[in-house]
C-alpha cells in the first residue's frame, strides 16, 4: 500500500506522523470513542478462524475497495487461496496509515498487505514485487521527462505530487514548490496536511494530467496504474530513477520492495504466507500485469 496512504515515507516519518496524529486524536475524545467502537465491532465480526486469513483493510482505491476489486484485495485473496484459506477483510474505517496501529497491533486482523519490506513496525514476508515512483505525462506531448534534473520541470505550468512523498521533497529541491503549493492545496480543498492525514486522490492526479491542468505528475506506480490504463487520454508512465539525489547529495530512493506484514511474534503465519507467496507467484504476476503496474526486480 502506497505512501499516498502513508507507507512510502521513510520509516521514521511514518512513526512521527502516526504519533502526531495520535496526539491530535487525544484532543478529539468523542470522535476517538466512535473509532474505538468501530474497531471493537470489527473485532467482533472477524473472530480468528483457522479457515480464514484476516486481512487488515482500509478503503483506498484503486488498491483496496470494499467490492474486493482493489489491487491489494485481489492479491490478498490469491495468497489466502494458496494457503487453503478464505480472505476475510477487516475494514478499519480509517486511512490505511493506521492499519498497523489500530488493526494489526490490536489483533482485530492478522496481516497488512502492501507494506515496504523494511517496515520496522512489523515482521514482513518475503517481497512479492517491487515498484516505484513514475513521471506521469500525456503521450501526445513532447515531454518525456526521465529525471528530476530535466530543466523542463522548471518551466511546466503545474506539477502534481503527493504530500509527504519523494515527489514533494524533490519539488521543493528544484525550487518550484511555492509555485505549485496553492494548486496542490486546491486539489484537497485547501486542507493543510499538518497534524491530519490529507492526500491527493490518485484518480484526481491522473485526471489533472490527462486534462492538461498539470503537465507532469509524480506518483507511486501502483496507485495510478489502473487509472492510467483506463484513461481515454493516452498517458505515459516513466520510472523515476532510483539513483535520484537532492541538490545537497542526499539519496532519494524511488522504488520499494512490497511485502505483507504480520505481528512481530507471529513467525508461524509469516512462514505460511511466504510459502503461499511462492505458490501464488504466477497469479500475482498476472494481476500486476493486468493492472498495468510498473514492476522492477525485487532487491532481495
Curated annotation (Swiss-Prot):
Domain of life of the organism encoding this protein: Bacteria
Broad class of where this protein is predominantly found: periplasm
Pfam name, any one: SBP_bac_3
Gene3D superfamilies: Periplasmic binding protein-like II (3.40.190.10)
Its biological purpose: May be involved in the assemblage of active methanol dehydrogenase and/or its cofactor PQQ in the periplasm.
Cysteines engaged in disulfide bonds, as pairs: none
GO cellular component: periplasmic space
Subcellular location: Periplasm
InterPro entries: Methanol_oxidation_MoxJ, Solute-binding_3/MltF_N, TAT_signal
Extent of the signal sequence: 1-25
Name listed for the protein in its UniProt record: Protein MoxJ
Regions that span the bilayer: none
Protein keywords: Methanol utilization, Periplasm, Signal
Gene Ontology biological-process entries: methanol catabolic process
Amino acid at each position: 500500500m502506497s505512501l499516498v496512504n502513508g507507507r512510502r515515507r521513510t520509516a521514521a516519518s511514518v512513526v512521527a506522523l502516526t504519533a502526531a496524529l495520535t496526539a491530535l486524536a487525544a484532543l478529539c475524545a468523542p470522535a476517538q470513542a466512535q473509532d474505538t467502537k468501530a474497531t471493537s465491532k470489527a473485532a467482533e465480526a472477524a473472530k480468528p478462524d483457522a479457515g480464514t486469513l484476516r486481512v487488515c483493510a482500509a478503503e483506498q482505491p484503486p488498491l483496496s475497495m470494499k467490492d474486493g476489486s482493489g489491487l491489494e484485495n485481489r492479491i490478498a485473496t490469491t495468497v489466502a487461496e494458496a494457503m487453503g484459506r478464505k480472505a476475510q477483510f477487516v475494514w478499519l474505517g480509517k486511512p490505511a496509515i493506521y492499519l498497523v496501529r489500530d488493526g494489526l497491533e490490536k489483533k482485530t486482523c492478522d496481516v497488512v498487505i502492501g507494506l515496504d519490506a523494511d517496515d520496522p513496525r512489523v515482521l514482513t514476508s518475503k517481497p512479492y514485487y517491487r515498484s516505484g515512483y513514475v513521471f506521469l505525462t500525456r503521450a501526445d506531448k513532447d515531454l518525456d521527462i526521465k529525471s528530476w534534473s530535466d530543466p523542463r520541470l522548471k518551466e511546466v505550468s503545474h506539477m502534481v505530487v503527493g504530500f509527504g512523498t519523494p515527489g514533494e521533497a524533490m519539488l521543493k529541491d528544484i525550487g518550484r514548490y511555492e509555485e505549485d503549493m496553492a494548486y496542490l492545496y486546491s486539489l484537497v480543498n485547501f486542507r493543510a496536511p499538518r497534524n491530519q492525514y490529507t492526500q491527493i486522490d490518485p484518480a484526481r492526479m491522473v485526471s489533472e494530467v490527462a486534462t492538461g491542468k498539470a503537465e507532469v505528475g509524480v506518483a507511486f506506480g501502483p496507485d495510478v496504474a489502473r487509472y492510467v490504463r483506463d484513461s481515454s487520454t493516452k498517458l505515459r508512465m516513466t520510472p523515476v530513477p532510483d539513483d535520484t539525489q537532492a541538490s545537497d547529495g542526499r539519496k532519494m530512493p524511488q522504488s520499494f520492495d512490497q511485502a505483507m506484514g504480520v505481528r512481530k511474534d507471529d513467525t508461524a503465519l509469516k512462514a505460511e504466507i511466504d510459502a503461499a507467496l511462492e505458490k501464488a507467484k504466477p497469479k500475482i504476476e498476472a494481476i500486476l500485469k493486468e493492472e498495468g503496474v510498473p514492476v522492477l526486480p525485487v532487491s532481495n
